[in-house]
Swiss-Prot record:
Binding annotation for ATP: G106, S107, T108, G109, S110, G111, K112, T113
Biological process per Gene Ontology, one example term: microtubule-based movement
Record has Acetylation as a keyword: no
Gene: KIN8B
InterPro entries: Kinesin-like_fam (IPR027640), Kinesin_motor_CS (IPR019821), Kinesin_motor_dom (IPR001752), Kinesin_motor_dom_sf (IPR036961), P-loop_NTPase (IPR027417)
Keywords: ATP-binding, Coiled coil, Microtubule, Motor protein, Nucleotide-binding
Gene Ontology molecular function terms on file: ATP binding; ATP hydrolysis activity; microtubule binding; microtubule motor activity
Protein family membership: Belongs to the TRAFAC class myosin-kinesin ATPase superfamily. Kinesin family. KIN-8 subfamily.
UniProt keyword annotation of Nucleotide-binding present: yes
Cellular-component GO terms for this entry: cytoplasm; kinesin complex; microtubule
Kinesin motor domain location: 14-349
Organism expressing this protein natively: Oryza sativa subsp. japonica
Protein name from the UniProt record: Kinesin-like protein KIN-8B
Alphabetical list of SUPFAM superfamilies matching this protein: P-loop containing nucleoside triphosphate hydrolases
PROSITE patterns: KINESIN_MOTOR_1, KINESIN_MOTOR_2
Length: 735
């Protein structure tokens, strides 16, 4: 029997920013001056490093002195334990099913790795965090059982490696519609004590790429992410509720200048890749900080694998702490101010936190069987590969075979990278176009509101605010169009490289003696490209399904907002011969404020439709419907009353006289608004290619369907979503 309850409530949290200043080193004490002052544990002052300025320049405010305020500021004498005291509450939520992210940000040599990893006498935030988790699990007096697992990866030169595997290959990122960004093939180890995680942490750190530079004798050349997952479930009960909390502890590599490090060769290339990924992170921080002021700014997560991994921590379902590490030396002034500048912008970032609640059911056993079968298949393939390698090693023309195999491996790797790059570019372009679509929808509403306001009062403050907001949206659209042009150019270059690789394969097939093998390789790679491109469509479909679940939850809120309880709804449905697909509603009356919950598996059932209940009056209060990116207010018989409509994700307000999507005759006014979807059991609507959105532009997965109408004379509700018209009889249309 389906349960009816509200979805997990979301809380908005602001990214917490702490600044930690390390002491001067022995060499810095001889050649540098201390320029950092900490005031009241929340304010930091960076003094002007130039002491040669005269009095006139100082009184004319020609100084480089900078002042910043943060949640917490730690002087050079503070230990890692002092930092951890103020962020431990964030870590404790992981045991309750919440996500948390802690990352250290700063230039090379500023103390990031020391802060995150620490030493035996001064343990870092990583060590203190997993000790807290196991202490909380041990002290828990409930009957719940806990399962703790951890993984450890690094991002080196835009390639992901597993630090818990002795000889890890290249790992790829995958997007899961439920769990978000995941690393395919990453090893996750179950642990039962903090000492075991510490052992794994030491093993991973020994495999991490580090080099000695003039700026830092133990410079980290990669970004490292330690992820701890805590699953909490009731003991001995099948089908019980499961809470899944995740803690991500990130030690970033430091930005550096080639002129300061005097690097060359591989070290120089490593530094360039580090700076490129950190620049992508800085751009994401800028865009997220700008969203509260300028609205729908595109966030370029796909410009780097690091930013894709940190996506949840920066703007998704996570409570996040950023520890900015700085050096007090005067010759590090520019690095220090740059770090504090981005940390100051990060204070504006907001995340949306909710518990990760799941239920165990029969699908789990199916997945386990599939995994077991795949593991058996992988073992067989590894065995066959070892036999083939042995056969190659005993051939008389061993050197020639090795050269051919090396060439094939390089070609295979380049082809895979080309396909993955094209997927990321196409997804990024799709996301950017969706952002611009919403911008243009808001621009249309603003133009309508400005036109109405000009008729009333041309000099009002409301008109000025609307005009200013309109200019901000136009700037966002222009910036996004420029970014889109850059993505299209990159896609063209990627396609050109794809053709080059195909030509190389065809040439080798025609010239090499082993033509059959190369022909098979060519066909395999071409099929691999096709399969990878189909994954894009699958990811889009997953997003469609997720959006549809949210729409159905909103529809239940609308139904209960009319004043009907579950018993009344069941009676109305029975009179019209309407039932829920699967099984009927229970007779007991739930809280009218709670919509039904749906299983995370399956095709978004159950669906319902009801006739308009004439006997039930509509609630006189406004019904605010949270849907996607907007909140719409429906007021019965007040269609011409000016209403303040609010775009919640933009924190912007503007006047609209026709917020209701229906006119006096009961006909819908679409105005680009997405509407709920209902269907009858006799003619259920297909969910194929359905996506809540607007009719202003078509999406890549939009599809035309024939128009259908209700036959019994009731008022019609036309639903247009991404050029997909659907007609159905609902009680919402008669309100």
């Amino acid at each position: 029997m389906p349960s009816i309850r509200a979805p997990a409530s979301k809380q908005t949290a602001t990214l917490q920013v702490a600044v930690k200043c390390r002491p001067l080193t022995d060499s810095e004490q001889r050649r540098s001056r201390h320029i950092i002052q900490v005031i009241d544990d929340k304010n930091v002052v960076v003094l002007d490093p130039d002491l040669s300025k005269d009095y006139l320049e100082l009184i004319q405010n020609r100084t480089k002195e900078r002042r910043y305020s943060f949640d917490h500021v730690y002087a050079p004498g503070c230990s890692n334990a002092d930092v951890y005291k103020n962020i431990s509450s964030t870590i404790a939520g992981v045991v309750q099913g919440l996500n948390a992210t802690v990352f250290a940000y700063g230039s090379t040599g500023s103390g990031k790795t020391y802060t995150m990893v620490g030493t035996h006498s001064d343990p870092g935030l990583m060590v203190l965090s997993f000790r807290t988790i196991f202490d909380l699990v041990k002290k828990d007096d409930s009957k719940d059982t806990f399962e703790v697992s951890c993984s450890y990866l690094e991002v080196y030169n835009e390639v992901i490696y597993d630090l818990l595997e002795k000889s890890s290959g290249h790992l790829e990122l995958r997007e899961d519609p439920v769990h978000g960004i995941m690393v395919a093939g990453l090893r996750s180890i179950k642990v039962h004590s903090a000492d075991k995680i510490l052992e794994l942490l030491n093993i991973g750190n020994s495999r991490r790429k580090t080099e000695s530079t003039e700026a830092n004798s133990t410079s980290s050349r990669s970004h490292a992410v330690l992820e701890i997952t805590v699953k909490r479930k009731q003991k001995g009960q099948y089908g019980s509720q499961v809470l899944r909390g995740k803690l991500a502890l990130v030690d970033l590599a430091g930005s550096e200048r080639a002129s300061e490090t005097n690097n060359f060769g591989q070290k120089l290339r490593d530094g360039a890749n580090i700076n490129r990924s950190l620049l992508a992170l800085a751009n994401c921080i800028n865009a997220l900080g700008k969203q509260n002021k300028k609205g729908l700014a595109y966030v370029p997560y796909r410009n780097s694998k690091l930013t894709r991994i940190l996506k949840d921590g920066l703007s998704g379902n996570s409570r996040t702490v950023m520890v900015a590490t700085i050096s007090p030396a005067d010759d590090q002034y520019h690095h220090t101010t740059n770090t504090l500048k981005y940390a100051d912008r990060a204070k504006e970032i907001k995340t949306h936190v909710h518990k990760n609640i799941g239920h165990l059911d029969t699908h789990v056993e199916d997945y386990k069987r599939m995994i077991d079968n795949l593991q058996v298949e992988v073992s067989q393939l590894k065995k066959e590969l070892a036999e083939k390698e042995h056969q190659l090693s005993v051939k008389p023309t061993e050197k020639a075979a090795d050269n051919e195999l090396s060439w094939l491996n390089i070609l295979s790797q380049e082809t895979g990278e080309n396909v993955q790059e094209r997927i990321n570019l196409q997804k990024a372009l799709f996301e950017l176009e969706e952002t611009n679509k919403r911008n243009r929808m808001e621009l249309q509403h603003l133009d309508d509101a400005i036109a109405r306001q000009q008729v009333k009062d041309k000099d009002s403050a409301v008109l000025q605010a609307l005009t200013s907001r309109r200019q901000v949206i136009l700037d966002n659209i222009r910036d996004n169009d420029e970014a889109g042009a850059g993505y299209r150019k990159d896609i063209e270059l990627n396609e050109s490289r794809k053709r080059q690789l195909q030509d190389m394969i065809e040439e080798a097939t025609s010239n090499n003696g082993n033509r059959t093998y190369l022909h098979i390789l060519s066909q395999y790679r071409l099929l691999g490209m096709t399969n990878a491109e189909l994954q894009i469509e699958m990811a889009m479909r997953d997003q469609v399904i997720y959006n549809q679940r949210e729409s159905l939850r909103s529809l239940w809120n609308i139904i209960y907002g009319t004043g009907l309880n579950q018993k009344q709804i069941s009676k109305l449905a029975a009179k019209q011969g309407l039932t829920i697909e699967g099984c009927p509603l229970p007779v007991s009356s739930p809280d009218v404020t709670t919509p039904p919950s749906f299983s995370p598996h399956g095709r978004l059932s159950p669906f319902m439709s009801f006739p308009s209940p004439q006997s039930q009056p509509y609630s006189p209060s406004a019904c605010f419907v949270q849907h996607g990116f907007s909140t719409m207010s429906y007021l019965r018989n007040q269609h011409e009353t000016p209403t303040v409509c609010r775009q919640e994700h933009l924190s912007s307000y503007y006047m609209m006289s026709e917020c209701s999507p229906f006119d006096g005759d009961g006909k819908q006014k679409t105005n680009g608004r997405s509407m709920p979807y209902f269907s009858t059991p006799g003619k259920p609507k297909e969910m194929y290619n359905f996506s809540p959105g607007t009719e202003s532009e078509r999406t890549p997965c939009s599809k035309e369907y024939p128009t259908s109408y209700s036959r019994n004379g009731d008022s019609l509700v036309q639903i247009k979503v991404n050029s997909l018209p659907l007609y159905t009889k609902t009680m919402i249309g008669n309100l």
